[in-house]
């Protein structure tokens, strides 16, 4: 196959129009609003996921932080469903786009930082200068800590993008190797196919773990600022 290795990560275009927005909205269709009071299996799964996510992320938060629970749960479900849909063959994974992840991380980071400066002004400013810093190092460390603060959303986005992209690239390479070996040595092809199957299972786990890690980082920064 002569397909470009990075072709799966290119933004899909239909009639000359990028359809990234449509793809991003697609996961919301997996969690439709119930139109009746009687519970069914879909609603039961939604409630279970909501309770589990809330329990894992919100236990350490103060009452002010608890008000962010729905946003954090929605964030986790969105990233997880987007990552899992990207595992389908010939599909596009929006979370492999650094621009999207940065655009998602910056508002969340800005919200937590703004909340911190509004509720804990002195403590937020104190984070810019480690305790016990020598006087002659104060200007330098303040600049370094400020830069570190502004780099945080980029670090979140790069972590998510790199992990999802690396997994998809590795699966693509092993899949191409398996197809090539089928005409050369069936035993070797079977071994690489087994590795591909195990890697696919691992990538499903990574898709969920990365969604959890991204949401957990937002939750931890929120905890420090509320």
UniProtKB/Swiss-Prot annotation:
Keywords: ATP synthesis, CF(0), Hydrogen ion transport, Ion transport, Membrane, Mitochondrion, Mitochondrion inner membrane, Transmembrane, Transmembrane helix, Transport. InterPro entries: ATP_synth_F0_asu, ATP_synth_F0_asu_AS, ATP_synth_F0_asu_bact/mt, F0_ATP_A_sf. The chain crosses the membrane at residues 5-25, 68-88, 97-117, 136-156, 189-209. This is ATP synthase F(0) complex subunit a. GO terms for cellular component: mitochondrial inner membrane; proton-transporting ATP synthase complex. It comes from the Eukaryota. One of its GO terms (biological process) is proton transmembrane transport. Subunit a, of the mitochondrial membrane ATP synthase complex (F(1)F(0) ATP synthase or Complex V) that produces ATP from ADP in the presence of a proton gradient across the membrane which is generated by electron transport complexes of the respiratory chain. ATP synthase complex consist of a soluble F(1) head domain - the catalytic core - and a membrane F(1) domain - the membrane proton channel. These two domains are linked by a central stalk rotating inside the F(1) region and a stationary peripheral stalk. It comes from Balaenoptera physalus (Fin whale).
